[in-house]
Curated annotation (Swiss-Prot):
Its EC number is 5.3.1.9. PROSITE patterns: P_GLUCOSE_ISOMERASE_1, P_GLUCOSE_ISOMERASE_2, P_GLUCOSE_ISOMERASE_3. Pfam families: PGI. InterPro entries: G6P_Isomerase, G6P_Isomerase_C, Phosphoglucose_isomerase_CS, SIS_dom_sf, SIS_PGI_1, SIS_PGI_2. HAMAP family: G6P_isomerase. GO terms for cellular component: cytosol. It catalyses: alpha-D-glucose 6-phosphate = beta-D-fructose 6-phosphate. This is Glucose-6-phosphate isomerase. GO terms for molecular function: carbohydrate derivative binding; glucose-6-phosphate isomerase activity; monosaccharide binding. It is found in: Cytoplasm. Gene3D superfamilies: 1.10.1390.10, Glucose-6-phosphate isomerase like protein, domain 1. It comes from Zymomonas mobilis subsp. mobilis (strain ATCC 31821 / ZM4 / CP4).
């Protein structure tokens, strides 16, 4: 497959996108009585309302031509086939094999690895490690953000084990867990693709020392390795039955579907984890089969590119009106910004348009009393998303959940409609875009579909920008410099400011 297939056609399509007429959201609703049905997509137990975005038939036609110019169908097919679309690292991209999509051999391998994970979970449940109440999961980046999201969202009330996820190398993070967990009833899962990640290995060593200090006879025998480098885990003395591999071709930010999801599978039970996978697979089918104008990830990417490239928006906000999804914005920060925060295209040339949004967000209704002032009356355009479950899971007075939902819907309406006032300080300009994503209830299948939606949206944005969404070279330089400072703090090659900081704190 060519890297940038037809630059002239892509440039022409972008010009057509930029030339589309500008209308307010109110005008778009007034001119099209079918707008709501045209821009609402229901799939995989989720309801996406894109009608409060400035998309219309003219823009959709232009963006579909851009898809064609970018050879989108072929690139999507290559993604689903697990081909080597990570061209800068010459790697296949195979996280979707965990959900049953890809080369038959890769799907079979994923099933084998899932079976190993299930066997270990059943052994833990059966008492193979004695009485187990706690799991300490140690990882960083994608090895921690995904499991942490799943556990916080799905196991607050029904978790079978008490799971803590530690990613920060700051010792206070581990100490907080040590205060709460009984070391004799704790297992430790160490998640690292290479099984050499410096922060993760340091935290794992400290966890082993904690167990030894409290008289655990065989701390190593209570360690579980989640890795794409099982040989390295074996070298450290971890028995094969406690090594849960995943494929080298699975990137960290796409890895929660693999053995990296072990802590969530342990806490949820295997059936719950399987439902998560099935939800992701349902969104896969939708993304592959639905026409662009009724395809949720594609429509979301169209809106992203319109607001970024045409309207100059630099950020987008994710606001979950569900306390259990408070970690979703942090998870999406890595997914979107590490994937598409690039400056060169597939041919190594500087890209012509802004790359990924800065992703941020919060939880409603808290965020309304913190950041919505800027969203309603500030000078920056910030497309936002509201995410909510129709049914409550708490046992309190139903007025709690009703108030939560009414606030979410009211914010979207207010952002769109605005309100005039003789006093400029009390005037709301309106015409500010939002997308609302609803689910009947927050369950593993719905969360799996939601995460897969964001994955496919991120991929589509990458194709439209002509970039590789699956490498992350931008994280390397800082790590290299950290090693250099640790090994040679006296090094005179650093800038004057950094040398002064080293002198003040590290000598």
């Amino acid at each position: 497959m060519a890297r940038i297939a037809n630059k002239a056609a892509i440039d022409a399509a972008w010009k057509q996108v930029s030339a589309c007429s500008e209308k307010t959201l109110k005008q778009l609703f007034e001119e099209d009585s079918n707008r709501l049905s045209g821009l609402v997509v229901e799939t995989a137990k989720l309801r996406f309302d894109f009608s409060k975005n400035h998309l219309d038939s003219q823009k959709l036609t232009a963006f579909k031509k851009l898809l064609e110019a970018c050879d989108f169908d072929a690139r999507r097919k290559a993604l689903f086939a697990g081909e080597k679309i990570n061209i800068t690292e010459d790697r296949a991209v195979e996280h979707m094999a965990e959900r049953g999509q890809g080369a038959p051999a890769s799907v079979a391998r994923a099933k084998e690895y899932h079976a190993r994970m299930r066997t270990l979970i059943e052994a833990i449940d059966a008492g193979a490690f004695g009485e187990v109440k706690h799991l300490l999961h140690i990882g960083i980046g994608g090895s921690a953000l995904g499991p942490k999201l799943l556990i916080d969202a799905l196991t607050r009330e029904s978790g079978r084990y008490d799971v803590a996820v530690v990613s920060n190398v700051d010792g206070q993070a581990l100490e907080e867990v040590f205060k709460k967990f009984n070391p004799h009833k704790t297992l430790i899962a160490v998640a690292s693709k290479t099984f050499t990640t410096a922060e993760t290995m340091l935290n794992a060593e400290s966890a082993m020392e904690w167990m030894k200090k409290h008289g655990v006879e065989d701390p190593q025998g209570r360690m579980i390795a989640l890795t794409a480098n099982p040989a390295k885990a074996s070298e450290m003395g971890i028995d094969d039955t406690r090594i849960l591999p995943f494929a080298e071709s699975i990137g960290g930010r796409y890895s929660l579907w693999s053995s990296i999801g072990f802590p969530a599978a342990l806490a949820l039970g295997w059936e719950g984890f399987q439902q998560l996978l099935e939800g992701g697979a349902a969104m896969d089918r939708h993304f592959l089969e639905a026409a662009p104008e009724k395809n949720a990830p594609i429509l979301a990417a169209f809106a992203d590119q319109y607001y970024s490239a045409v309207r100059g928006a630099q950020t987008h906000g994710i606001f979950a009106y569900d306390e259990r999804l408070q970690l979703l914005p942090f998870y999406l920060q890595q997914l979107e910004m590490e994937s598409n925060g690039k400056r060169v295209d597939l041919d190594g040339n500087l890209i012509d348009h802004p790359s990924a949004f800065i992703t941020w967000g919060g939880v409603g209704t808290d965020a309304q009393h913190a950041v919505f002032q800027l969203l309603h009356q500030g000078t920056r355009l910030v497309p936002i998303e509201f995410i909510a479950a129709i049914k409550a899971d708490d046992t309190l007075n139903p007025v709690h959940h009703k108030t939560l939902l009414t606030n979410a819907f009211a914010q979207g309406a207010a952002l769109m409609s605005g309100r005039d006032n003789k006093d400029p300080a009390r005037s709301y300009p309106g015409d500010r875009p939002s997308t609302t994503i609803l689910m009947e209830e927050l369950r593993p299948a719905q969360l799996g579909a939601l995460i897969a939606f964001y994955e496919h949206r991120t991929f589509t944005n990458g194709v439209l920008l002509g970039i590789n969404s699956f490498d992350q070279f931008g994280v390397e330089l800082g790590k290299e410099m950290a090693h250099a400072i640790a090994d040679h703090p006296e090094n005179s090659d650093f800038d004057p400011s950094t040398k002064a900081l080293i002198a003040a704190a590290l000598k």
